[in-house]
């Protein structure tokens, strides 16, 4: 094959990649990053955002759970690698990455009172709890400060809106390139996680009186005045 033919093929390949990238950003990226979230939730300033003000990317995913926050919080509180409760997603994928996740269907009393400063994970995957409001907010930040992951619970009329917000900074070109396949991959994992929490919380609420759930600890936590988008409404998105 001649040099001109190779150059032409290379130009066509780069052109196709460029077109695919534009189509992805314009047509698919918003749906992937904001699965399940309303426009108000996707654009709202949520608790935990203050931990990484200048973010290169934001993902906001959400689900409505037919259970009160008291039945949802236990699964959020104990999230994390073994011996904690896992991430309620595809464990086999997590463990291929060496994350030591084993999702449990049980509430683990030893991990029901997360504290600011608690550390999850190992090495470069370490996350530290930075904001804890029992039954309302759990926000953690990576050790390098480039990733913040927040769970926000909004309860109304016995239902809970669970919002998962990821804010991330991409300080290098390799990080930016690596994020392209990570965005759809993270949707696969996080969608499974949100449904996993929903199933566990609804089962817990159906089999156990709400009042019997462990009371929240206020030690090492703070309370915000945040109100969710549409807080004036008595109903949550379906």
Where are these regions (language model features)?
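Membrane-penetrating hydrophobic segments
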Residues: 1-13
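Short, charged/polar surface micro-motifs in flexible loops or helix N-caps
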Residues: 70, 81-82, 134-137, 146
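A short, structured loop/turn motif at beta-sheet edges
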Residues: 66-70, 131-135, 152-161, 201-205
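Short, surface-exposed coil-to-beta transition loops
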Residues: 58-59, 124-125, 146-150
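Long, non-transmembrane cytosolic or organellar matrix-exposed soluble domains/tails
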Residues: 160-169, 182-238
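Beta-strand/loop substructures that line and gate deep hydrophobic ligand-binding cavities in soluble
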Residues: 35, 42, 141-199
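Hydrophobic ligand-binding cavity/cleft-lining segments
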Residues: 12, 18-116, 206-231, 236-238
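Short, hydrophobic/aromatic-rich segments at coil-to-beta transitions
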Residues: 113, 117, 131-140
